[in-house]
Amino acid sequence: MNKEQLQQMRQAPGFVGALDQSGGSTPKALKAYGIQPDAYQSEEEMFDLIHQMRTRMITSPAFATGKIIGVILFERTMRGKIEGMPTADFLWEKRHIVPFLKVDKGLQDEANGVQLMKPFPELGKLCEEAVGYHVFGTKMRSVIKQANEQGIRDIVEQQFQWGKEILSHGLVPILEPEVDIHCPEKAKAEEILKRELLAQLDKMTEPVMLKITIPTVDNFYKEIIEHPMMLRVVALSGGYSREQANELLSRNHGVIASFSRALVEGLSVQQTDAEFNAMLEASIEDVYQASIK
């Protein structure tokens, strides 16, 4: 594990960019960027286009301001290159950004008010590959739809079970038990989640990271942020607009952003490089300001 990267993730001001759209969410991301579905004929072409968009973002001067401390990548992006260098190496060596890899394979159908991650027996193999690409950590998402005690316990147990396997490969996991912002008893679900997370953290011997939905009650996750086994807590934008997500985030001290959609809002394939860079820089500045409050 890279000690300098560990220090950066523990205490550097800034936020984590999420560029980990997978097959399912890529058409939506491309459409928002101004590329219609009829512009590509195959999955291969679709992934090439999204890689071009990500390359444009990562190579933009806006990405070199030191305000983004980490970036979450999709598998294909990790295996790809930017300006002739493997993506993770380019991020760290040219941008001083810590690379993470999305490792889940999507969600199971809802049961007990939650969606667990699909089983993934190849997790260890993917972790080894990530280590070979000089990736620092991972991220995996499951979703809480209802304030169901059993379901939430299952979610947290699965996240920590995967997390321990990931740690055994020398990678730092970002656990992401997202609470759906439309959950009818969101505050209650968060109470159960916090209790289960603290119970698991108390049993850990190596620190992990956590990605959460911005809580209903400001500063609700304070004990988790201060827990010795918690490296850093980041927040997802979860369907809120960038303005709304930034506003909510700025009220939660010690939590930094890990936004994807809110980061690319307003970017377009039609923009000149100057327009694109200015828009991206403004987005990064907004998210950064909300993260350091």
Swiss-Prot record:
Q: Which pathway, metabolic or otherwise, does it act in?
A: Carbohydrate degradation; glycolysis; D-glyceraldehyde 3-phosphate and glycerone phosphate from D-glucose: step 4/4
Keyword entries, A-Z: Glycolysis, Lyase, Schiff base
This enzyme catalyses: beta-D-fructose 1,6-bisphosphate = D-glyceraldehyde 3-phosphate + dihydroxyacetone phosphate
Q: What is its EC number?
A: 4.1.2.13
Entry-linked SUPFAM superfamilies: Aldolase (SSF51569)
Into which family does the record put it? Answer: Belongs to the class I fructose-bisphosphate aldolase family.
Q: What is this protein called?
A: Fructose-bisphosphate aldolase class 1
